[in-house]
């Protein structure tokens, strides 16, 4: 299993309930196919640098997970099919990126406490 990180932007016209349903849908998609969720972050509503689909903002979410490559292809296909997703980007994490992500999560945890 490889280590991946996906950031996706949801349409800003969605209600809070619709956003939670969408995030839960994608999380369940991964876990039902044997993925191990490492981290899940809600970055909230953020202004974008440029308009996407005539929208100036979007709900940003980040998933960090371990999964097999063939499941990742199906996961990205689900993003493309869902109208609520405006953009997404998935990157494979190497050992340096994994350690950086762990430090970032620890720093976030210490600032929230």
UniProtKB/Swiss-Prot annotation:
Which keywords belong to this entry? Ribonucleoprotein, Ribosomal protein, RNA-binding, rRNA-binding
List the GO molecular function terms. small ribosomal subunit rRNA binding; structural constituent of ribosome
Query: Can you cite an annotated GO cellular component?
Result: ribosome
Q: Which Pfam families match?
A: Ribosomal_S6
Keyword Ribonucleoprotein on entry:
yes
Annotated GO biological processes are:
translation
UniProt family annotation: Belongs to the bacterial ribosomal protein bS6 family.
What the entry lists under InterPro entries is as follows:
Ribosomal_bS6 (IPR000529), Ribosomal_bS6_sf (IPR035980), Ribosomal_S6_plastid/chlpt (IPR020814), Transl_elong_EF1B/ribsomal_bS6 (IPR014717)
Q: Where is the signal peptide?
A: none
This chain's function reads: Binds together with bS18 to 16S ribosomal RNA.
- Identification of the protein by name: Small ribosomal subunit protein bS6
């Amino acid at each position: 299993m490889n280590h991946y990180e996906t950031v996706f932007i949801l349409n800003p016209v969605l209600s809070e309930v619709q956003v939670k349903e969408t995030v839960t849908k994608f999380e369940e998609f991964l876990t039902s196919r044997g993925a191990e969720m490492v981290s899940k972050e809600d970055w909230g509503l953020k202004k974008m640098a440029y308009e996407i689909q005539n929208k100036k903002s979007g709900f940003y979410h980040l998933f960090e997970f371990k999964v097999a490559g063939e499941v990742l292809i199906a996961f990205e296909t689900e993003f493309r099919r869902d109208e609520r997703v405006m953009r997404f980007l998935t990157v494979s994490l190497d050992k340096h990126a994994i350690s950086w992500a762990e430090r970032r999560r620890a720093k976030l945890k210490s600032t929230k406490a």
